[in-house]
Amino acid sequence: MAAKIFCLIMLLGLSASAATASIFPQCSQAPIASLLPPYLSPAMSSVCENPILLPYRIQQAIAAGILPLSPLFLQQSSALLQQLPLVHLLAQNIRAQQLQQLVLANLAAYSQQQQLPLVHLLAQNIRAQQLQQLVLANLAAYSQQQQFLPFNQQLAAAYPRQFLPFNQLAALNSHAYVQQQQLLPF
């Protein structure tokens, strides 16, 4: 029983220390060496340190390595910036060569793909010519149809007015409409 109580107290103490532990962010200027005991070896101190501090150590090492070489680094970066358009141009040339190789490998498919708009245009022209031939062949029927068009429109406009009373009666009372149709002379 005493062992269980002791374990419970230890767990409580560990959770309290974990809850109140302080974490040093990357931008902190606190030296890491002062946080670790001085009697630990450098290999042991790197193992024992908090994993959150690892990016801070890497950042410090990079800054220490770059600062003495900063003029050289600036010259190299400016040279790289000047070479970027050349790299872009080289990449475009490589893409163009790959496209040319693809075209040569699939010349038949490429030519069919290029001719698709022409095929659609040709089909539309053929349809238009067929329609023109149909109109020329049936010019007499076409002209008669155009001459009777105003008459047909007038007839279509007058037709619903002529049967309107019967249709209203049919809608209201279908039995009376049927009787009325039977009484009409043929």
Swiss-Prot record:
MF terms in GO: nutrient reservoir activity
InterPro entries associated with the record: Zein (IPR002530), Zein-alpha (IPR051903)
Disulfide bonds: none
Signal sequence, start to end: 1-21
Key words, A-Z: Repeat, Seed storage protein, Signal, Storage protein
Record flagged with keyword Signal: yes
Job description of the protein: Zeins are major seed storage proteins.
Family: Belongs to the zein family.
Additional remarks: The alpha zeins of 19 kDa and 22 kDa account for 70% of the total zein fraction. They are encoded by a large multigene family. Structurally, 22K and 19K zeins are composed of nine adjacent, topologically antiparallel helices clustered within a distorted cylinder.
Protein name in UniProt: Zein-alpha PZ19.1
Source organism of this protein record: Zea mays (Maize)
